């Protein structure tokens, strides 16, 4: 049994402005939630989005530190995704109007580990490095090895 919690960000400003789920982390104890779910022998994962157009390095670090705290509460794995706007969403409209989408942007090719936006507070190269470091730091070796086995080999 598995459940993945859509925390998205540890920053209320980011959640309120960009996230569709609007999970209010200030209204409950997420660590307690994870510990409670674990009592029922359910694996718990979380999803985080980083690299919003106006997200600062400090806000990204806050989200990563939050994920580390959740790992201390028994979290089994954390997924870190770089923002990839989907057509029809408010963030896609914003990024289109404000020049954040590269000319070759293709939403049909989901590349969650690649920086998909330009003109962000944190550079594309740094975002990719931060995301990779966060994924490696916040996940157990067993989960990382399992994920590697899922990768499709190209012909």
Language-model region placement:
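A structural motif corresponding to the C-terminal lobe/cap of the Radical SAM core domain
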Residues: 1-153
